[in-house]
Amino acid sequence: VKERYGDDIHEGDIFLMNDAYLQGTHLNDFTAVGPLFYRGELVGFGAARAHWADVGSADTGMVMGSSNIFQEGWRLGPTRVVEKFRELPDWFDLLTRNTRLKELTLGDFRAQIAAIRTGERRLGQLLDRIGVDTYKSACANIFDQAQRLDRAAIAALRDGTYYREGWIDNDGISDDPVKVAITVTIDGERLLIDLAGSSPPVKGSINCGAVQTISLLRLAYKTMISPERAITGGSFSTMEVKIPEDCIYNAKEPAACQWYFTTFGLLADLMISCLSEAMPERATAAHYGDSMVVVFASSYGAKRGWLSVEATAGGWGGSVTADGESALINLVNGGFRNLPAEVYETKFPVRVEEFAIR
């Protein structure tokens, strides 16, 4: 946002983007960003990301067989859609005309705006109490503390280089297996991650942008390195990630990205397995592997469209002290909650015949 708009950013503005290559996920994930002002001074930015149910792809909700980004919906770079608290009607018209689920989409977007407004209001209340200078000093100290603690945690581990690889059955279009490879090097206070050896971009829609790949690796890092500590702007300073240009995890236009998360469970497991060489007491074995969600959607021409994206659950690997847990959501979709069968049948024209652990 700052790169595109520079000083042309005002109190009350809201910017919106979903470009899969900029933010790393897929076109359904829209990030709303708003500047946070206090007494006329820009003191930060608030952001809220939400998965929009339908963005005009070839299929309702999430296209199944895409082979390029243009089949997956419309793509938006950082764009101002609210200016000085005034919604720009042309943009809102464009947003609602390009979705089959207008009410749900507009409701999600306005909830994102409300979240940013709430954050700005509460930050203002904090600054009323402590002042801007104290706030900035506290942020710097918190970030510095996180960096020091991360460096100490890595320095306490045994130096070494650890390699793992695994395979996804296919990319959803061809029958060719997809390779996932990772090398983790611990060198003093630094943790280096290299994805060289992973598959090049594939025809199917399981490619992923570099930004979200790094986010996934940070998640795996955090499960092993001081998970009890909060994540701040100083976290992950010891972690360096190298992703080859020609790689499934460094998607470029026109690579399809709809199901970008398909390989993420495996990649996280492989990184944890690498780190287990240096800290076996914290590691768990791999958890179940699948595409993580089941999608049902209304047929074309339905009077009222509907969409269900239900997270799957499965078994997690055991640790040195305990067996693995059963029926947990995948690590990547940890924010999902399973929907009770009664609610599911009420909301959607779907009958649940059995809900059980196999």
Task: Please place each PLM-identified region on the residue numbering.
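Glycine/proline-enriched, intrinsically flexible loops and inter-domain linkers
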Residues: V1-R358
